[in-house]
Amino acid sequence: MNISKTKQDLWEYLSEVRRPLALYGTGDGADKIISILENHGLKDLIAAVFASDGFVRERTFHGFKVMSYGDCCKALAPKDFIVLVCFGSSRPEVLSQVEKIASEHELYVPDVPVYGSILFDRGFFEENIPDIEEVFSHLSDDISRNCYVNYINYKLTGNITYLSDCESGPDDEFGLLDGISEGCFVDLGAYYGDTLIRYLKKYPCLKRAVAVEPESHSFKRLEKCAEELESEGFGITCINALVGSSTGTEQVSTARGRGTRALPNSNVELKNTRSIDVVTVDSLDIGKAGFIKFDVEGSELAAIDGAKDTILRDRPVMKIACYHRSEDVFALVKKVLEIRPDYKVYMRHTRCIPGWDTDFYFI
């Protein structure tokens, strides 16, 4: 099976053409991309930095004046520059702007790991072809196989046409999840309760939920959401903790944001920190698990390890995010099937750049 016929990854292509680069965005994603460009001897190709109109202001980023897209085009004219998008979004108006720019200039959205330091480049792909092909062989429908092939090719090239070729609607997953049986909904990475509402109201057989969220500001909103659901008859337990392979404590950043975990082997910088409990699924008092959602900021593999007994006992339907670390596209499936080889495996990607909002489903 030839998952990808790509002869070059994005970084090799940029090294070959050596054209000026305009970076779109000035956040953490841009920092990571600049670091990768530097590691590949390409930092000197950066010619400009621009932002969306509402974020320009009078400022600089890595020594470049932050411009609007229009000013960037004027400043670099008549050079044939390449745009690298350095942020993530699923907002329709942002995606429309990216598509507009892509119609006018060559544009890529580099795939860089949200957590960890392993880059999904051609070398990493070729090293892991046996595992990637094994996972492909386990996928249970044509939509999943198409999604997997396009997703791998996107990660190698940064070409967003691969993402658009594997998009599913946000409600398409309901066709997969109809097999959820009565039991507890375990929401790992519950944020402010959006997925509690989504799944509890869709699947009334889930009468009870345990929601785990580490980020303190989101947790306060989660508790308010839980109170409203409890008034409608649902039983909700909210836990302010990380999820891992064993119980204990860990240091996390106190900075506000959805990405809370700061692991020693991640690419998240530890600055101001606080101590927080780490729980496992197996340590929770959940009774029978009917559905588990894993979206735990790069700790999905560890969280699966910590849910092994529950998975063996209950065989819950599971939805597992697979976009935080480069190895997630094969390691997560292998891990689950080592525990229970009787799952059917599916994959879906909903509209977003870069390739976030991509999940495996175990049915």
Where are these regions (language model features)?
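Phosphate/nucleotide-binding beta-alpha loop and adjacent structural elements of enzyme active sites
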Residues: M1-K43, S52-I363
